[in-house]
């Protein structure tokens, strides 16, 4: 995780954009087999390795991909959707579109699933203009079928960014999706009902069932970053 932070910090210090920083940090996490994203994604119950990723910016752009095969860095494909007419692509269609844009196609070996371990990755970056970019990537929750869609590529569930605030979630995707967790935490802050920290605590404690593991990170255009979880979720913030 330190290497990913250093990569994003270097981009931002050099005057790069929030999108560039978030994507490149996410790529480093996808390339690390420790995490359930990209090269470290877990097998589905049929033995396949299917990858989801999303990217949203505070200026209203969005891209997400679902169930991609043979794509070690799905976040790069999501990033290429930011300026397209369409927002999201899935399955074979997503891979075909990635081929047309020159994205590398390579088998992802993946790894066996692990009980009780999530390891989805998320990055939120802010550049010198105050613009935000929120990137997430996953191989999906362990022991799920090939057709299953979790929270990561679903707007408002695994991520939400607009009006100077970005929120990203990780954990049990079904619970996150049912509660529309990222959007509702985001809305609670914007409505001035809570701070970043208290809104995340509210979201997990009030919207998520007891015993379900979930974590959140958030960042505003004019403040520090924050993280909160009801389980062991490593997170870090760099303030340049």
Language model segments and positions:
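Alpha/propeptide regions of enzymes that mature by internal proteolysis
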Residues: 1-240
């Amino acid at each position: 995780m330190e290497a990913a932070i250093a990569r994003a910090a270097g981009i931002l210090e050099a005057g790069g954009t929030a999108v560039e920083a978030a994507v490149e940090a996410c790529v480093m996490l996808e390339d690390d087999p420790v995490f359930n994203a990209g090269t470290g994604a877990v097998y589905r119950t049929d033995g396949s390795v299917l990858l989801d990723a999303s990217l949203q910016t505070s200026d209203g752009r969005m891209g997400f991909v679902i169930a991609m095969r043979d794509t070690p860095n799905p976040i790069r494909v999501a990033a290429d959707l930011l300026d397209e007419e369409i927002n999201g692509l899935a399955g074979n269609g997503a891979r075909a579109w990635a081929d047309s844009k020159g994205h590398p196609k390579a088998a992802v070996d993946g790894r066996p699933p692990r009980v009780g371990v999530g390891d989805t990755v998320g990055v939120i970056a802010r550049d010198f203009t105050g613009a935000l970019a929120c990137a997430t990537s996953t191989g999906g929750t362990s022991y799920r079928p090939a057709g299953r869609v979790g929270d990561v590529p679903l707007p408002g569930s695994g991520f939400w960014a607009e009006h100077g605030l970005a929120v990203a979630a990780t954990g049990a995707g079904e619970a996150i999706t049912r509660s529309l967790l990222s959007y509702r935490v985001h809305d609670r802050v914007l409505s001035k009902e809570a701070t970043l920290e208290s809104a995340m605590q509210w979201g997990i404690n009030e919207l998520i069932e007891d015993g379900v593991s979930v974590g959140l990170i958030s960042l505003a255009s004019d403040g520090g970053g924050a993280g909160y979880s009801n389980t062991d979720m490593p997170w870090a913030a760099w303030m340049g």
